[in-house]
Amino acid sequence: VSIFGAMFAPKPFDVAKEMVRVTRPGGRVIMGNWIPNDPTLVAQILKISSAYSPPPPEGFISPMTWGVESNVIERFGAAGIPKDKISFVRDTYTFNFPYTPPEFVAAFRRSYGPTMNAFDAAEQNGRASDLQRELEALFDSQNKSPRKDATSIPATFLRVTAEV
């Protein structure tokens, strides 16, 4: 099981192969992967953050490509899993945070790698306050909590099941 984890490892074909290798025959590999260009929170955080970050190194494969069914089929196929043994469900994870959206942005700034990197780059370019404003506007716009002192934001992801 890898929920929003293995998708961030480099070399996605090696990742799929290793997950299959360590799963016993008859077992399942289950992944939760963020979806590129999705209008919900995480894809939008990454989109905003990328505008403040330096370009990725040559050969970089975006972790978001794990949210594209054809890529997942290709990767697990190369690891020996036939297409008919791979299934997909779009699902929702709701971020519930007992503080305001700006405080939730601060938590992402402290603990979520892509956001941390974007703020590091934005600070070097004197644009950290712009990034902060954009992320706060995003979090505010997607917040579904009826309370002003809480944040509740649904985010869509692709649940992948590969039968080994």
Kindly label every feature range from the protein language model:
Residues 13-14, 20, 24-99, 115:
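Conserved catalytic/acceptor-binding region of the Class I
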Residues 1-13, 35:
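A short SAM/SAH-binding and catalytic strip from SAM-dependent methyltransferases
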Residues 1-4, 30, 156:
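Short SAM/SAH-binding signature in class I
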Residues 65-164:
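Conserved Class I S-adenosyl-L-methionine
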Residues 18-19, 162:
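Class I S-adenosylmethionine-dependent transferase superfamily signal
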Residues 4, 56-59, 144:
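A short, structure-level motif marking secondary-structure boundaries and short turns
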Residues 7, 20-21, 152:
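A structural feature recognizing the 12-helix transmembrane core of secondary solute carriers
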Residues 9, 13, 39, 125, ...:
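Non-membrane alpha-helical structural segments and their capping/turn regions in soluble enzymes
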